């Protein structure tokens, strides 16, 4: 029976592609790592690697073993985390995900409170698109995530808890040329002279933006790092769109400004939700984090967001 140490060594070698780097990653000497891999190959009765002068590559057997090894190691980590958390939250692990917008305000606030209450729990936070987070949840790489749930609500594999909805806005830097046009609300033609930046959006929102694009304003810059988008807007004439909650504090402080749009030009609202696997019991850490996210979501927003 091959033990998990050999599988960890094999996964490290597959990921690094080089014995020296893999040995360093798992704190072994190169000869010891080589012996471990050979023992794994002997135990399975097949060759897992093609050894080249500069790097190693996986055989067909190696690719199959890698897929199963990752699942076994994930299961081992989940088991150890669950056992350590059974009686308290003094240790263990929480693997959490967030979309670009909830990852900019809601989740960090809840996570700060969680870390203060449970400093012994190791947290891995992934900021990604709703699509990628969905896949990672189904692969058991995440236990819980917060993201746009428009395209996830009807998935029977998921448990989705809707969160507060925020109006969508288009924002710019203070002093932007469009802010001087206070005599009328801005139309698509007014916006067309400036690039519009935003994150990857669900189909429903993309359709609405497509209607805007037909009037001359496409989504010219796509970036899933909202902090980068805000910095881009602050330093240029680029416009960006977001739910109001993630820019409300900057608007209130005068670091960003909202554009007043013509009625119906941007009617979309946020659709955040808490997502976990249906029929799965959350770990104590994930359950505690879920409660903090719900509590933070219910708190009074900044004045400019009311």
From Swiss-Prot:
<dbReference type="GO" id="GO:0005829">
    <property type="term" value="C:cytosol"/>
</dbReference>
<dbReference type="GO" id="GO:0003677">
    <property type="term" value="F:DNA binding"/>
</dbReference>
<keyword id="KW-0010">Activator</keyword>
<comment type="function">
    <text>Activates the transcription of the sdsA gene for sodium dodecyl sulfate (SDS) degradation.</text>
</comment>
<keyword id="KW-0805">Transcription regulation</keyword>
<dbReference type="GO" id="GO:0003700">
    <property type="term" value="F:DNA-binding transcription factor activity"/>
</dbReference>
<dbReference type="InterPro" id="IPR000847">
    <property type="entry name" value="Tscrpt_reg_HTH_LysR"/>
</dbReference>
<dbReference type="InterPro" id="IPR050950">
    <property type="entry name" value="HTH-type_LysR_regulators"/>
</dbReference>
<keyword id="KW-0804">Transcription</keyword>
<comment type="similarity">
    <text>Belongs to the LysR transcriptional regulatory family.</text>
</comment>
<dbReference type="InterPro" id="IPR036388">
    <property type="entry name" value="WH-like_DNA-bd_sf"/>
</dbReference>
<dbReference type="InterPro" id="IPR036390">
    <property type="entry name" value="WH_DNA-bd_sf"/>
</dbReference>
<feature type="DNA-binding region" description="H-T-H motif">
    <location>
        <begin position="19"/>
        <end position="38"/>
    </location>
</feature>
<protein>
    <recommendedName>
        <fullName>SDS degradation transcriptional activation protein</fullName>
    </recommendedName>
</protein>
<feature type="domain" description="HTH lysR-type">
    <location>
        <begin position="1"/>
        <end position="59"/>
    </location>
</feature>
<dbReference type="InterPro" id="IPR005119">
    <property type="entry name" value="LysR_subst-bd"/>
</dbReference>
<keyword id="KW-0238">DNA-binding</keyword>
<dbReference type="Pfam" id="PF00126">
    <property type="entry name" value="HTH_1"/>
</dbReference>
<dbReference type="Pfam" id="PF03466">
    <property type="entry name" value="LysR_substrate"/>
</dbReference>
